[in-house]
């Protein structure tokens, strides 16, 4: 199965829209338990210049994703496409047309909350649990930083050097060291009389706390000495206001003997209120999707954001996604200060028009297939050419002369690496056979990308216990006496597995376009499956109007045609809802695998809602028209708990 779906763990809509009185804004409202998520912009409703906005936040559990990747259920970074999927929620209000939504990573921790009211905005957090337009959470703390002054610091080396402190309101102050005086006003740190680090650190504290800097909302407090009066000194500096806006940067790289302790950035641990009203978002990666009718679902590739969350060394913190209208479609508002007001966002590129209202189903919806999901799409198709081994031909492209052979090392029903090591060297040899056992000496074949004949080739480890080789073989490897090949696998000079004999085929061109039609069935499909199962389902196919000869008539198993390029989709029978579409684009996540027994697929039944009947449809690629042709068959089964 090449799809994994992760449902949201948190979601909430935040807004600065007016309540029904068109006077009070709902900036303190929370909608964390509502079953829909809402985005809109209302222009000039309360006044000729008023703007009302709605945005939403949504988070997915990367801890579970990391667990799946470690277990090998999810492929490595670079092999997975991550899609954020949100489903349109019909409603009785107007729907905007022709607009763009943007998705970006939220850059601060937020709380979901328990609000429900999306009309009157009456479910206020009152600075309690839950995010809203103003607050990310209720952990109201002020940011702090600790300066470390090196023991025995030379004040002469520090003279003339500067650093800048910025408070949560954005007010900045430059502080400059000076050994010519003892002034501690207006940002001067006068050290003329200082004789040791105790004196210097106290002077820094006095300069920061001086009343001449009344607009700087920062205070220096506790001093801690490592030893005597000239030892290392630490000074705790705090923002006076709580909130994320206090987490401002400090650069001490240009100051001798002075450094940050316990931080490389600056102020940290400020929490509670957003740094910017309406939420804090990372601007380095922004994804957009255009909507035409306004009734579309959202499906957007967020792979680079998710993979940054999953980085092993220095991951981004996962605070989820923020979804909103782009600046162009959010309402126009020009603040007299050029900054956001207490409730409205300064946006001079915005629209002087309304876009009301786009809704998506939230994580609390009762509709199983409308829940927001973070979908991992990847191609884990296995194409084992044992039953479709082609002998090399000069009329075939190099890629089509290659044949892929797999080895699966199952131990007590579970895949295990050979010798228990992911670095174990496994090799393959091919032998002629007149029946089912290897005969004679190993035959010569060629590896992928090589013109040199070999008799032994080291395999590639694809994943735990799964190995493969890509080879091409000339027609001389078989004969009328020995028409079959047998693969023998070796580790540490010991043969440990002999495969079943298979008969290579010679390429034969057609004189005209091949108009093939097929008969298909699913040979092991049961009527019911539990929703905690993953089932391997076999697909049998043969050409329609196939005429068996005396051999195939006498054979107990009918000839099984290997479909080299086929895909499947899933429908819910009750309403024909497509719950899994064909994956025939750049990521072929629903492509059929095949091995010596024919085609198959693996389906994780937890993707499906119990209590319903579902049906498979299949599509086979037609090389002549270069399109997938859906077959006229529907194979039904039911999922139960």
Give, region by region, the residue ranges found by the protein language model:
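A short beta-turn/strand-edge loop motif at beta-sheet boundaries
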Residues: 74, 92-95, 154-157, 368, ...
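A beta-strand/beta-hairpin structural motif
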Residues: 297-304, 460-474, 581-609
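Secreted, disulfide-rich extracellular signaling modules
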Residues: 1-144, 253, 261-480, 511, ...
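Internal, hydrophobic beta-strand segments that form the core of beta-sheet-rich folds
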Residues: 320-328, 480-493, 565-566, 600-602, ...
């Amino acid at each position: 199965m090449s799809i994994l779906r992760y449902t949201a763990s948190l979601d909430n809509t935040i807004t600065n829209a007016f309540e029904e009185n068109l006077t009070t804004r709902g900036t303190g409202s929370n909608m964390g338990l509502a079953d829909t998520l809402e985005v809109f912009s209302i222009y000039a409703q309360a006044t000729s210049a008023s703007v009302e906005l709605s945005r939403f936040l949504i988070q997915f559990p990367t801890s579970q994703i990391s667990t799946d990747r470690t277990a090998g259920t999810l492929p490595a970074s670079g092999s997975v496409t991550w899609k954020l999927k949100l489903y349109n929620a019909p409603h009785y209000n107007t729907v905007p047309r022709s607009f763009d939504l943007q998705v970006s990573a939220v850059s601060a921790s937020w709380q979901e909350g328990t609000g429900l009211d999306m009309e009157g905005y009456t479910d206020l957090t009152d600075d309690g649990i839950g995010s809203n337009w103003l607050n990310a959470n209720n952990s109201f703390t002020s940011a702090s930083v600790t300066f470390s002054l090196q023991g025995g610091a030379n004040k002469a080396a520090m003279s003339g050097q500067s650093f800048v402190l910025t408070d949560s309101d954005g007010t900045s102050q430059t502080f400059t060291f000076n050994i010519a005086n003892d002034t501690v006003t207006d940002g001067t740190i006068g050290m003329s009389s200082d004789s040791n680090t105790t004196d210097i650190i106290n002077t820094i504290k006095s300069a920061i706390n001086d009343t001449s800097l009344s607009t700087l909302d920062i205070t220096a407090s506790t001093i801690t000495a490592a030893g005597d009066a000239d030892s290392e000194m630490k000074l705790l500096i705090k923002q006076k206001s709580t909130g994320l806006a206090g987490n401002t940067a400090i650069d001490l790289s240009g100051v001798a003997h002075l450094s940050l302790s316990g931080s490389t950035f600056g102020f940290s641990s400020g929490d509670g209120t957003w740094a910017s009203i309406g939420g804090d978002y990372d601007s380095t990666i922004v994804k957009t999707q255009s909507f035409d009718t306004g009734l579309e679902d959202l499906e957007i590739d967020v792979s680079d954001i998710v993979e940054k969350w999953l980085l092993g060394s220095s991951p981004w913190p996962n605070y989820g996604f923020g979804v909103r209208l782009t600046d162009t479609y959010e309402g126009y508002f020009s603040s007299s200060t050029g900054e956001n007001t207490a409730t409205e966002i300064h946006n001079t590129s915005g629209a002087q028009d309304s876009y009301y209202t786009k809704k998506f189903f939230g994580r609390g919806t009762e509709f199983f297939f409308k829940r927001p999901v973070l979908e991992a799409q990847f191609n884990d198709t296995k194409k084992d050419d044992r039953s479709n081994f082609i002998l090399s031909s000069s009329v075939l492209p190099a890629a089509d002369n290659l044949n892929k052979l797999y080895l699966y090392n199952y131990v007590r029903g579970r895949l295990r690496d050979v010798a228990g090591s992911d670095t174990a060297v496994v090799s393959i040899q091919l032998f002629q056979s007149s029946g089912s056992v290897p005969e004679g000496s190993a035959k010569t074949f060629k590896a992928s990308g090589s013109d040199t004949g070999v008799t032994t080739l080291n395999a590639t480890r694809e994943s735990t216990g799964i190995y493969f080789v890509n080879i091409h073989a000339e027609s001389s490897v078989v004969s009328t006496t020995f028409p079959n090949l047998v693969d023998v696998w070796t580790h540490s000079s010991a043969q440990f597995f002999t495969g079943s004999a298979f008969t290579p085929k010679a390429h034969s061109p057609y004189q005209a376009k091949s108009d093939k039609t097929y008969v298909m069935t699913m040979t092991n499909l049961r009527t019911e499956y539990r929703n905690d199962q993953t089932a391997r389902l076999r697909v049998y196919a043969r050409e329609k109007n196939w005429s068996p000869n005396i051999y195939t008539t006498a054979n107990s198993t009918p000839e099984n045609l290997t479909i080299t390029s086929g895909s499947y989709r899933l429908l819910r029978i009750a309403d024909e809802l497509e719950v899994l579409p064909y994956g025939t684009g750049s990521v072929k996540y629903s492509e059929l695998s095949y091995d010596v027994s024919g085609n198959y697929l693996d389906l994780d039944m937890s993707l499906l809602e119990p209590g319903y009947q579902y049906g498979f449809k299949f599509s086979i690629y037609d090389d002549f028209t270069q399109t997938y042709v859906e077959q006229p068959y529907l194979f039904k089964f039911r999922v139960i708990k």
